[in-house]
Amino acid sequence: MANPTHLGFQDAMSPLMEELLYFHDHTLMILFLISSLVFYMIFALLFPKLYYPNTSDVQEVEVIWTVLPAIVLISIALPSLRTLYLMDETNNPCLTIKVTGHQWYWSYEYTDFSTLEFDSYMIPTQDLPQGHFRLLEVDHRMITPTNSTIRVLITAEDVLHSWAIPSIGTKMDAVPGRLNQVMITLANPGVFYGQCSEICGANHSFMPITMETIPLNHFQLWLEDSILS
C-alpha cells in the first residue's frame, strides 16, 4: 500500500494492474518524445542559424505532420483498446460477490450462497487494534480465494459511491438502480485497501474497503464457518 512519501502507483497486485502500469509507461514514453521534439523546435526557432526571407510549399513536410500524428494516435489506441477489453472480459467466474454502497458503509453478499451477507463498517480510531491502519480497517473484510476469477457486482442503495482498490487496478462507480461489474483475479494472498472514490456526503472519508485474499482451502473453511454461524 502507499506510504506518505509515495508519488507513483502502488505495486501491481493483479494482472490487470500490471497491464495498466504498462500502458501508463508506454503512453508516458510517447509523451516524453513528443515534448522533446516540441522543445527542440521551439529552441531552434528562437535561435535560428539560417534565415529564409521567402517561404514555399513543401509537400513532404505536410505529409510528415499528417502521417506522424496518426501513427502516434494508433500506437496509443491499440494498447488502450486491449486494456479496455481485459477490464470487461468475463470468463466463467468461480465466485460472484455483490457489493452495495450505503451512507457510509459497504455491504457484501456472496450470491452463490443464499445466507452469506454482511455489512462492513470502518473501525473507529479509539477501537483500532495496535498495528492496524487508521481509516482503512473494517470490522468485516471481503474475503476472496487466490487463483480464482471473481465477478464483483457493484451498486448503491442511496447516492453515488465508487468501489476502488488501487493496488489491483479496480475502480467502479456504484450507481443506485444499476449493476456494474468488475473482474478480479489475484495470484497471491494478501490484504488490499481502498476507499470510496466518489464524494457521497459528510462521512465520505470514513467508508474504507478492505479485501483479504486467502488460499482456496482456507477460503472453504471460512465459508463453512460463516455459513454455519
Curated annotation (Swiss-Prot):
Entry annotated with the keyword Disulfide bond: no
Subcellular location field: Mitochondrion inner membrane
Keyword Transmembrane helix: yes
Name this protein carries in UniProt: Cytochrome c oxidase subunit 2
Region forming the signal peptide: none
UniProt binding sites for Cu cation A2: C196, E198, C200, H204
InterPro entries: CcO_II (IPR045187), CcO_II-like_C (IPR002429), CcO_II_C (IPR034210), Copper_CuA (IPR001505), Cupredoxin (IPR008972), Cyt_c_oxidase_su2 (IPR014222), Cyt_c_oxidase_su2_TM_dom (IPR011759), Cyt_c_oxidase_su2_TM_sf (IPR036257)
Amino-acid positions noted as binding Cu cation A1 in the UniProt annotation, renumbered to this chain: H161, C196, C200, M207
Amino acids binding Mg(2+): E198
SUPFAM superfamilies in alphabetical order: Cupredoxins, Cytochrome c oxidase subunit II-like, transmembrane region
Cofactor binding description: Binds a dinuclear copper A center per subunit.
GO cellular component: mitochondrial inner membrane; respiratory chain complex IV
Assembly and oligomerization: Component of the cytochrome c oxidase (complex IV, CIV), a multisubunit enzyme composed of 14 subunits. The complex is composed of a catalytic core of 3 subunits MT-CO1, MT-CO2 and MT-CO3, encoded in the mitochondrial DNA, and 11 supernumerary subunits COX4I, COX5A, COX5B, COX6A, COX6B, COX6C, COX7A, COX7B, COX7C, COX8 and NDUFA4, which are encoded in the nuclear genome.
Cofactor(s) the protein requires to work: Cu cation
Topological category with respect to the lipid bilayer: Multi-pass membrane protein
Record's function text: Component of the cytochrome c oxidase, the last enzyme in the mitochondrial electron transport chain which drives oxidative phosphorylation. The respiratory chain contains 3 multisubunit complexes succinate dehydrogenase (complex II, CII), ubiquinol-cytochrome c oxidoreductase (cytochrome b-c1 complex, complex III, CIII) and cytochrome c oxidase (complex IV, CIV), that cooperate to transfer electrons derived from NADH and succinate to molecular oxygen, creating an electrochemical gradient over the inner membrane that drives transmembrane transport and the ATP synthase.
PANTHER family with a match to the protein in the record: CYTOCHROME C OXIDASE SUBUNIT 2 (PTHR22888:SF9), CYTOCHROME C OXIDASE, SUBUNIT II (PTHR22888)
EC number: 7.1.1.9
Database matches in Pfam families: COX2 (PF00116), COX2_TM (PF02790)
Transmembrane segments: 15-45, 60-87
Main location: mitochondrion
Native organism: Alligator mississippiensis (American alligator)
Segments on the Mitochondrial intermembrane face: 1-14, 88-229
Reactions that this protein is recorded to catalyse: 4 Fe(II)-[cytochrome c] + O2 + 8 H(+)(in) = 4 Fe(III)-[cytochrome c] + 2 H2O + 4 H(+)(out)
GO biological process: ATP synthesis coupled electron transport
Keywords from the UniProt entry: Copper, Electron transport, Magnesium, Membrane, Metal-binding, Mitochondrion, Mitochondrion inner membrane, Respiratory chain, Translocase, Transmembrane, Transmembrane helix, Transport
Residue spans, topological domain Mitochondrial matrix: 46-59
